[in-house]
Amino acid sequence: MEREIYTSDRNPDSADTSWLSKLGPGLITGAADDDPSGIATYSQAGAQFGFNLLWTVLLTYPLMVAIQLVSARIGRVSGHGLATNLRRHYPPSLLYGVVILLLVANTINIAADLRAMGAAVNLLIGGPARAYTVALCAISLTLQIFVPYRRYVRVLKWLTLVLFAYVGVVFAVRIPWSTVALRTILPQFSPSADYITTLVAVFGTTISPYLFFWQASQEVEELNATEQQPLVKKPAQSAATLGRIRVDTVVGMGFSNVIAFFIILTTAVTLHAHHVTDIQTAAQAASALKPIAGNLAFFLFGVGIIGTGMLALPVLAGSAAYSMAGTFGWKNSLALDAQLAKRFYGIIALATIVGLALDFTSLDPIKALFWSAVINGVTSVPIMVLMMLMATNPNVVGTFVAPLTLRILGWLSTAVMAAAVFAMFLFL
């Protein structure tokens, strides 16, 4: 982020701070991963294949933690977001290509999430879904532009609680826990195009480029908000700060994967068990639950769609704005007044409004989401490669090179995503 960095000997990441206070960028990033588009993907996985894709949560968790840790470390150690570091250390053509693909994918995701949120309100209380979509868009945009950063982050933290709705759904249905445990540890693979495509979609939903940009930039926001310096300039703070990042990321990604597990589990034990196997939207999943699992499950699922959408929209729009601002060296911070960072907030508004506009076109939301997943997958691999290179580049991180275990897991995560992209194109 291009803004003044203040100095202080006080370290808010020190051991005497509360455990909950250590949760911030990682928690919000992990929760935002379970957006309405992700909910639709996990719902389809459970509805179509029952318990047989629960194992993916066990695989993606350590990989997701590793790559998000790399992202967070780059931001906190260097004092700059991913796009700024790419601009400073890599060819412009590579940066421009990555950012354009990110903008396209994020805008389509915003459109899909807004539509799902409007449909969820319609399911719960009736009325015009499109009017709800517009209203929710306006509320989200107003919060992003006019609410001060520290208060805004507290709002996002509270919104993560809505994800427990998907845990609550489990208590409304009967779960064969022994079978669940068996299928999670010993899954039954199906070498079919549908199985591979859904598997790729789950990987692509779980490990997404916008999460990389958001968490790195949020670490810089936290650095500035607490009047700290980057670790390359203040190495004495590294133990406490990197420890806080570890806790935050491990908990945040764990939260994300637990919720994903419960969404797959809920739809498997309800929809799949009743031969409802074609779920294409989150709202459709909520609607299908009602006659099978009852009003409570339906209500919790619907509320979850709205809450996760409100959490994910600022992450999608914000990561697009951070990437553009970092690319061109603009002022960028949610802590800055909109008048002081007009272009940064302009991108947030533009991405959100264009996403809303797409909902009033003939664009097929399911096809749009599919191609968004393709773009996300294609974009994530080169970004992950560049992140792993930055994490070991002394020009970026100084002496804070990623440790061996993190490098191994980071490259493994990159290899899994590359294989997923290859499989995606193989079955297109």
List each language-model region with its residue ranges.
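Flexible loop linkers connecting adjacent transmembrane helices
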Residues: 2-8, 41-44, 69-94, 119-121, ...
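Juxtamembrane transmembrane-helix boundary signature
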Residues: 29, 56-89, 97-111
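Extracellular/periplasmic helix-exit of transmembrane alpha-helices
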Residues: 65-77, 217-225, 254-284
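Hydrophobic transmembrane alpha-helices that form the core helical bundles
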Residues: 73, 77, 95-126, 133, ...
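Loop-to-transmembrane helix boundary motifs in multi-pass membrane proteins
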Residues: 92-93, 130-134, 296, 300, ...
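Transmembrane alpha-helical segments of multi-pass small-molecule transport proteins
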Residues: 99-100, 124-146, 162-171, 340-354, ...
